[in-house]
Amino acid sequence: MTSRKKVLLKVIILGDSGVGKTSLMNQYVNKKFSNQYKATIGADFLTKEVMVDDRLVTMQIWDTAGQERFQSLGVAFYRGADCCVLVFDVTAPNTFKTLDSWRDEFLIQASPRDPENFPFVVLGNKIDLENRQVATKRAQAWCYSKNNIPYFETSAKEAINVEQAFQTIVRNALKQETEVELYNEFPEPIKLDKNDRTKPSAEGCSC
């Protein structure tokens, strides 16, 4: 038996500008936080190697600009994603309201094989701030209505729930990657109607 190959997982972080996507990524990968805000231009990514159930996994985490002019980054950017992280700011209701459009944008551009079960994770960021505007129950209700998406309330600044959230992200992404590999290795069998079983094929293979 050949040794198990190294797994590369592509994770995309989406959300409005200023919700803390870059800060969350930097806190998880580099254990750093900066109070200086610098808008992401286009897209950028960081990598991190983690062990999951004795498997070495390399996470390629893509951070995107939230401005509308960058919203359509192209099919190549979205394709091949194993998990999509949707981020909003709990102190800014408008960033929560746009989660639907970000989710739809991803599904349209990425065209996953099984969109109904594609793994999303939602992060309500900046819980360290006092002027909270989006209630936990409201966010949980939205996630439940979207096939029960896992939801975490985070603070990139205080490193609250960041590690826990990304553990769920990598496990869900790994599950998606495994299912895709199995799908590619074992294509769906041809289903014959019971009336077709006794009929010889006159057309031959339709491949």
UniProtKB/Swiss-Prot annotation:
**Motif Switch 1: positions:** 28-41
Reactions the enzyme catalyzes: GTP + H2O = GDP + phosphate + H(+)
- The record places the cross-link (Glycyl lysine isopeptide (Lys-Gly) (interchain with G-Cter in ubiquitin)) at K191, K194
Annotated membrane topology:
Peripheral membrane protein
Residues annotated for GTP binding in this entry: 17-23, 34-35, 37, 40, 66, 125-126, 128, 156-157
Q: How is its activity regulated?
A: Regulated by guanine nucleotide exchange factors (GEFs) which promote the exchange of bound GDP for free GTP. Regulated by GTPase activating proteins (GAPs) which increase the GTP hydrolysis activity. Inhibited by GDP dissociation inhibitors (GDIs).
Which residues are annotated with the lipid modification S-geranylgeranyl cysteine? Answer: C205, C207
Matching entries from CDD domains are given as: Rab7
Q: Which cofactors are named for this entry?
A: Mg(2+)
In the record, which positions carry Cysteine methyl ester? Answer: C207
Where in or outside the cell it occurs: the entry states: Cytoplasmic vesicle, Phagosome membrane; Late endosome membrane; Lysosome membrane; Melanosome membrane
Q: Which PROSITE patterns match?
A: RAB
Motif Switch 2: which residue numbers? 67-82
Instruction: Give the UniProt keywords, A-Z.
Output: Acetylation, Autophagy, Cytoplasmic vesicle, Endosome, GTP-binding, Hydrolase, Isopeptide bond, Lipid degradation, Lipid droplet, Lipid metabolism, Lipoprotein, Lysosome, Magnesium, Membrane, Metal-binding, Methylation, Mitochondrion, Nucleotide-binding, Phosphoprotein, Prenylation, Protein transport, Transport, Ubl conjugation
Q: Does the keyword Phosphoprotein apply?
A: yes
Mind telling me which NCBIfam families this protein's record contains? small_GTP
Domains: entry comment = Switch I, switch II and the interswitch regions are characteristic of Rab GTPases and mediate the interactions with Rab downstream effectors. The switch regions undergo conformational changes upon nucleotide binding which drive interaction with specific sets of effector proteins, with most effectors only binding to GTP-bound Rab.
Protein name, entry field: Ras-related protein Rab-7a
* Gene from which this protein is expressed: RAB7A
